[in-house]
Amino acid sequence: INDILHAQNFPKIYTFDIETEISDEFPDPEKAEQKVVSISLVGPDMSCIVYGLKQMNTEQKELFKTRYLDWIENNPFAKKLRGNKTPKVLYEYFESEEKMLERFFTVIVPKIAILAGWNAYRFDWQYLVNRIFKLFGKGMAYNMIRKASPIGETKQISWKEQDGTSVRVPGPCHSEIIDYMEIVKQYDYILRPYESYSLDWVASHAVDANKIKYEGTLQQLQR
């Protein structure tokens, strides 16, 4: 018991990323007009689950799994996180965007101590929050964010834009949402000066990891 009490137990960090349907306009997180078509979650051991609106057959799921595991195998940083176990790779289909978002906020987020993303404040989390406001209305949306909290309470996630404008978005208490881009901008001095704050540039220079290359269009990718 003494060892347990004095052990350094760090909360597990899960990373998330969303994709929206393709349109002629770039998705605006403040308006959240386009449908959210997928939400990806990656655990600390590189296990991955994707929630999506596209039905995939067994062959497509296996191809998705193979490509992901191959990417890990070819990246030393990802292999180190993976350890000796093979990561789980799952895809869960949802009939509607509403059902997918409701599950994410009310079932998934409450189980996660720290949910992290790249540019998560300005895009992913802000988009998800404004999207549920649009789909469910203010009252039900706030109720979903409360359910995302293990104590049933909300807080304000805030940041400043380059012009000094303060932005606030509701988030769950005790389910921490963090933005790696904000952390890098404020606290990292090793890679400066930055040529770009894109995830691909920072990851390639920090841990020698690149995004999976795709030669087709986004429309083709979502088919």
Where do the protein language model's features map onto the residues?
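Metal-dependent phosphoesterase core characteristic of DEDDh/y 3'-5' exonuclease domains
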Residues: 36-46, 114-223
